[in-house]
């Protein structure tokens, strides 16, 4: 009963804010930014936010966040930041001319005050897996709710894409007018060529496995022998940094074993894009990060240990896996170690294929994506 009452109060409150958003005039020089439900300061929104703060003082840029630790960090950097759904956040949102997000307005900011503002959807990367409407078209129930509660409709003004190939997928996935999709490149990729932050003489690889929603998956189930892997990496002079999804975390016993390794590092990077250039090669299975890593023209090793199961149990892919993954495919840790060694001996082995796929999915590689996105936003305000 309390849950129903709370939902009704939220709806009434939302209706009031939605009506106010019709009345209160928007200020085109106030832009609000958010990312990943307010829990992270990362991704495309972060990089555009910092670009605007640095280069366009005429714009009042504000970050909206749920995480109070992040708020403190940003305040210490002299950024303007408010807690999501706080009175200050709602009041400034009612006046903001641009809502800039990485996931969607409801999650990253607040959907209620967004009427008459320009919604800029930066998204969070080129999709290999099918997304949004391409996965599940809206049900009649969802359509009815959006009709009854019009503020639930996210009317995107600009959706940024990295290439014309990516734009084709976004048209169907978002169900959006193609004219609203702008090929600008992703703001986060402007920092890919930044100076290295992890300094060591040894070679370094970053391993980014994808979370499986429909079934349990553990990368260490596929012929992983701790001592063999440790010795092999030592002999090659290679460190592997593995970022696991929280739900894929190994048990405590296995984590203790991994913590004794000198060459395997389980890490949690808040913003992987700020350090991608530090690594000599990337290991992944289905993570769309590799589309960005292509810009560095470094080796990529694909480790789809459970490829057949993934394709049958998880979301469909937009492409034939082998046609858009320019690099060797490892079926287990034994093959993965062999491919790491091969990539160190012949780093240019797949370079032509890397360039082919890079050019298909990335139109720009000039570190001016933020500038292009900024110009597109200004054009519609």
Language-model regions, residue ranges each:
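A donor-sugar binding/catalytic signature common to diverse glycosyltransferases
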Residues: 99-130, 269-314
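N-terminal pre-catalytic "stem/leader" segment of glycosyltransferase-like enzymes
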Residues: 1-90
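Catalytic binding pocket for nucleotide-activated donors in carbohydrate/polymer assembly enzymes
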Residues: 288-361
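C-terminal alpha-helical cap of glycosyltransferases
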Residues: 366-381
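A nucleotide-sugar donor-handling region in carbohydrate enzymes
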Residues: 3-17, 128-221, 246, 345, ...
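Donor nucleotide-activated moiety binding/catalytic core segment of transferases
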Residues: 81-98, 246-291, 324
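Conserved catalytic-core segment of nucleotide-activated headgroup transferases in glycan assembly
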Residues: 42-50, 54-56, 181-183, 187-256, ...
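Extended catalytic core of nucleotide-activated donor transferases of GT-like folds
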Residues: 46, 78-142
């Amino acid at each position: 009963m309390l849950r129903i009452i709370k939902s009704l109060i939220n709806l009434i409150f939302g209706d009031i804010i939605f009506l106010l958003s019709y009345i209160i005039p928007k200020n085109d020089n106030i832009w609000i930014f958010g990312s990943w439900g307010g829990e992270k300061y990362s991704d495309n929104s972060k990089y555009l936010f910092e670009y605007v703060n640095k280069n366009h003082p005429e714009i009042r840029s504000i970050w909206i966040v749920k995480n109070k630790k992040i708020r403190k960090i940003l305040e210490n950097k002299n950024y303007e930041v408010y807690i999501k759904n706080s009175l200050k956040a709602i009041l400034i949102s009612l006046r903001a001319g641009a809502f800039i997000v990485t996931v969607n307005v409801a999650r990253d900011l607040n959907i209620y005050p967004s009427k008459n503002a320009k919604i800029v959807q930066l998204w969070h990367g080129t999709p290999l897996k099918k997304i949004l409407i391409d996965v599940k078209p809206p049900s009649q129930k969802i359509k009815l709710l959006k009709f009854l509660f019009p503020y639930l409709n996210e009317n995107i003004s600009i959706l940024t894409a990295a290439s014309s190939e990516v734009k084709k997928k976004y048209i169907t996935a978002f169900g959006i007018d193609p004219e609203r999709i702008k090929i600008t490149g992703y703001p986060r990729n402007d920092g890919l060529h930044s100076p290295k932050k992890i300094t060591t003489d040894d070679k370094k690889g970053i391993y980014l496995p994808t979370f499986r929603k429909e079934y349990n998956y553990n990368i260490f189930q596929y012929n992983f022998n701790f001592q063999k892997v440790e010795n092999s990496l030592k002999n090659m002079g290679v460190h592997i940094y593995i970022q696991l999804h929280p739900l894929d975390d190994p048990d405590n016993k296995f984590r203790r074993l991994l913590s004794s390794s000198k060459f395997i590092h389980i890490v949690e990077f808040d913003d992987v894009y700020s350090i991608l250039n530090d690594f000599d090669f990337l290991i992944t299975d289905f993570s769309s990060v590799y589309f960005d890593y292509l810009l560095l023209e470094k080796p990529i090793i694909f480790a789809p240990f459970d490829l057949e199961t993934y394709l049958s149990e998880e979301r469909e892919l937009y492409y034939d896996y082998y046609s858009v993954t320019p690099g060797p495919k490892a079926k287990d840790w034994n093959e993965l170690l062999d491919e790491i060694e091969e990539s160190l001996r012949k780093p240019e082995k797949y370079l032509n294929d890397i360039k082919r796929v890079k050019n298909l999915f990335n139109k720009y590689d000039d570190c001016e994506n933020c500038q292009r996105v900024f110009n597109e936003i200004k054009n519609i305000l």
